[in-house]
UniProtKB/Swiss-Prot annotation:
It catalyses: a long-chain fatty acid + ATP + CoA = a long-chain fatty acyl-CoA + AMP + diphosphate; (5Z,8Z,11Z,14Z)-eicosatetraenoate + ATP + CoA = (5Z,8Z,11Z,14Z)-eicosatetraenoyl-CoA + AMP + diphosphate; hexadecanoate + ATP + CoA = hexadecanoyl-CoA + AMP + diphosphate; (E)-hexadec-2-enoate + ATP + CoA = (2E)-hexadecenoyl-CoA + AMP + diphosphate. InterPro entries: AMP-binding_CS (IPR020845), AMP-dep_synth/lig_dom (IPR000873), ANL_N_sf (IPR042099), LC-FACS_euk (IPR045311). It is found in: Mitochondrion outer membrane; Peroxisome membrane; Microsome membrane; Endoplasmic reticulum membrane. This is Long-chain-fatty-acid--CoA ligase 6. It is a single-pass type III membrane protein. SUPFAM superfamilies: Acetyl-CoA synthetase-like (SSF56801). Belongs to the ATP-dependent AMP-binding enzyme family. It comes from Homo sapiens. It is linked to A chromosomal aberration involving ACSL6 may be a cause of myelodysplastic syndrome with basophilia. Translocation t(5;12)(q31;p13) with ETV6. One of its GO terms (cellular component) is mitochondrial outer membrane. Catalyzes the conversion of long-chain fatty acids to their active form acyl-CoA for both synthesis of cellular lipids, and degradation via beta-oxidation. Plays an important role in fatty acid metabolism in brain and the acyl-CoAs produced may be utilized exclusively for the synthesis of the brain lipid.
Length: 697
């Protein structure tokens, strides 16, 4: 068909008549056409583009041959597990030196005083101070070897990192201590790890350590170094029990005068011993090598390399405890690329103020903080209209997220979400959440509202931090991503809970270069965690989803994490509460998506009436079980016993339901040996538990 015929059919002018056609149009029409063309051109060049995932999101992991059903990431260059990302960064010492080299001696560690801007230590300043401190430690009877354990008992601050780097510079091993361990656990750690030197931030912590020495509980402790100023009386008190008290500055000055050449570690050398708080018995010291930590964050780098790779201008806000590996691994990623880490002032209530001053680009969080953000946003939508508009805007942005578009410049951002983004400093491009499962509802909303990439990981200290991670581009919720390229994951049968690997369910086991070497001086518990083939048994129950991602569905042992990441052993708590006079039976319930515990209490029919009468409350057993004042009194008595027994606040129940009928074998809530059947109790009291959480929020 000829061109003229086509144009005639379409009723368009022939090419020779185009000039006459445009001359026939009015000036207003021509301007309008030009404006429309400009708008279309602008939209075409600036339209939001979907993020390109690094793999097929319908197949994010694949089965490993001859491995008993283990799966691996499809991201990577071959079947070999990833041990490192950079050849010049195979130890934590080399990681920091790489950052020093590529940063051009840029800013490294930031801190601020109230209502002041951030002040920065450069990479070279940090490296110099680390060498001075390490040399000073050598002058105080420490040795440059992996048998030398140095305790660090401090809140997040630049000095923490300087101490850590000082240890790595001279092949020493870091042993973090933290408040929630409790005095007994700290005493146990100092003795088990043969710690002679502890570096603390505040004089109060030095006093706590001295009290142990004075009671002859930690005879090996000989040197306490303080970051903050202290009174001369503290030094004198230390002298009386044979402990030298020094300021960190004095030790650095000593090291500067007696500088020693670095003694760098090897990848297989021990870098850190992380003692988990434990729920029964003494804490366990997970031994992690330099290679473990490097392998773990290298897996993260491999997964994200094509999408959101770390940069020198990245800034991380540090407020999650440095004693936990999740924070340590994320920070290592930043140092490796010459980025900056700014520390919060130490008060979580001022975190938003710190973020506005710092303007971080990377924001590691725990689900509890995400829940708070979500609740605060919706609490401000205090009318039905505001809430409807907020939900409408979120749905529009969630539709974009589902199509792979992540942005913060849409009309919905301008109208609704920019203030939320500004409260985080306005520059966040990546949020990483871990330590406990995140609510799919909260995660889905915040991915839309915050206009940045939000990743979720799963793991534990024993596999350094993470073993699974969200694949970029997969913004679905309700799972913890695919295996990292540094480890394999397999599920094994849990017969007693009716989970079978052949059905894609079972206990999660991890094997790879990020898996720890065992528990310090604890071969029995090491054998429980690590089998003869090197598989770490996590105790969590997982399920493979069709896309090759992992979903956490249960816990093998009755130990779980709350939303803030704290481990809780309900049976230990129940054994304390059962000592309350009116309590005959109790079931303590926790949820990884909630921040506190609740309980189901069955009162003792013989004790309850007289116990209530002493408190001025009378009635039949049935009446007493519905009495709100009596329920309050029982809860107060339980909490009292909990405090006397040393329970932490997160181990105390915040609300209870009184149930009048006893748990029994007949009603299916007890085993024949009269042990609680926890899954059945959870299901039986599902409605009451939901009500307790809704009332207590």
């Amino acid at each position: 068909m000829q061109t003229q015929e086509i144009l005639r059919i379409l009723r368009l002018p022939e090419l020779g008549d185009l000039g006459q056609f445009f001359r026939s149009l009015s000036a207003t029409t021509l301007v309008s056409m030009g404006a429309l063309a400009a708008i279309l051109a602008y939209w075409f060049t600036h339209r939001p583009k979907a993020l390109q995932p690094p793999c097929n999101l319908l197949m994010q992991s694949e089965e490993v041959e001859d491995s008993g059903g283990a799966r691996r990431s499809v991201i990577g260059s071959g079947p070999q597990l990833l041990t490192h990302y950079y050849d010049d960064a195979r130890t934590m010492y080399q990681v920091f030196r790489r950052g020093l080299s590529i940063s051009g001696n840029g800013p490294c560690l930031g801190f601020r005083k109230p209502k002041q801007p951030y002040q920065w230590l450069s990479y070279q300043e940090v490296a110099d101070r680390a060498e001075f401190l390490g040399s000073g430690l050598l002058q105080h009877n420490c040795k440059a070897c992996t048998d030398q354990f140095i305790g660090v008992f401090a809140q997040n601050r630049p000095e923490w990192i300087i101490v850590e780097l000082a240890c790595y510079t001279y092949s020493m091993v870091v042993v973090p201590l933290y408040d929630t361990l409790g005095p007994g656990a700290i005493r146990y750690i100092i003795n088990t790890a043969d710690i002679s030197t502890v570096i603390v931030d505040k004089p109060q912590k030095a006093v706590l350590l001295l009290e142990h020495v004075e009671r002859k509980e930690t005879p090996g402790l000989k040197l306490i170094i303080l970051m903050d100023p202290f009174e001369e009386a503290l030094k004198e008190r230390g002298q009386k029990c044979g402990v030298v008290i020094k300021s960190m500055q004095a030790v650095e000055d000593c090291g500067q005068e007696n500088h020693q050449a670095p003694v760098p570690p090897q990848p297989d050398d021990l870098s850190i011993v992380c003692f988990t708080s434990g729920t029964t018995g003494n804490p366990k010291g997970a031994m992690l090598t330099h290679g473990n930590v490097v392998a773990d964050f290298s897996g993260f780098l491999k997964v994200t390399e094509k999408v959101i790779f770390p940069r020198q201008d990245d800034v991380l806000i540090s407020f999650l405890p440095l004693a936990h590996m999740f924070e340590r691994v994320i920070q290592s990623v930043v140092y490796c690329h010459g980025g900056r880490v700014g520390f919060f002032q130490g008060d979580i209530r001022l975190l938003s103020d710190d973020m506005k001053a710092l303007c971080p680009t990377i924001f590691p969080v725990v689900p509890r903080l995400l829940n708070r953000m979500y609740d605060k946003i919706f609490s401000q939508a205090n009318t039905p209209l505001k809430r409807w508009l907020l939900e409408f805007a979120a749905k529009r942005k969630q539709a974009e997220v589902r199509s792979g578009i992540i942005r913060n410049d849409s009309i919905w951002d301008e109208l609704f979400f920019n203030k939320i983004q500004a409260s985080l400093g306005g520059c966040v491009r990546m949020i990483v959440t871990g330590a406990a499962p995140a609510s799919p509802t909260v995660l889905g909303f915040l991915r839309a509202a915050l206009g940045c990439q939000v990743y979720e990981g799963y793991g534990q200290t024993e596999c350094t931090a993470g073993c699974t991670f969200t694949t970029p581009g997969d913004w679905t919720s309700g799972h913890v991503g695919a295996p990292l390229p540094c480890n394999h994951i397999k599920l094994v049968d849990v017969e007693e809970l009716n989970y079978w690997a052949c059905k894609g369910e079972g206990e999660i086991c991890v094997r790879g270069p990020n898996v720890f070497k065992g528990y310090l001086k604890d071969p029995d518990r090491t054998k429980e965690a690590l089998d003869s083939d090197g598989w770490l048994h996590t105790g969590d129950i997982g399920k493979w989803l069709p896309a090759g991602t992992l979903k956490i569905i249960d816990r093998k042992k009755h130990i779980f994490k709350l939303a803030q990441g704290e481990y809780v052993a309900p049976e230990k708590i129940e054994n304390i509460y059962i000592r309350s006079q009116p309590v005959a039976q109790i079931y303590v319930h926790g949820d990884s998506l909630k921040a506190f515990l609740v309980g189901i209490v069955v009162p003792d029919p013989e004790v309850m009436p007289s116990w209530a009468q002493k408190r001025g409350i009378e009635g039949t057993y049935a009446d007493l079980c519905t009495n709100k004042d009596l329920k309050k009194a029982i809860l107060e008595d339980m909490v009292r016993l909990g405090k006397e027994s040393g329970l932490h606040s997160f181990e105390q129940v915040k609300a209870i339901h009184i149930h009048s009928d006893m748990f029994s074998v007949q009603n299916g809530l007890l085993t024949p040996t009269l042990k609680a059947k926890r899954p059945e109790l959870r299901e039986y009291f599902k409605k009451q538990i939901e009500e307790l959480y809704s009332i207590s929020m």
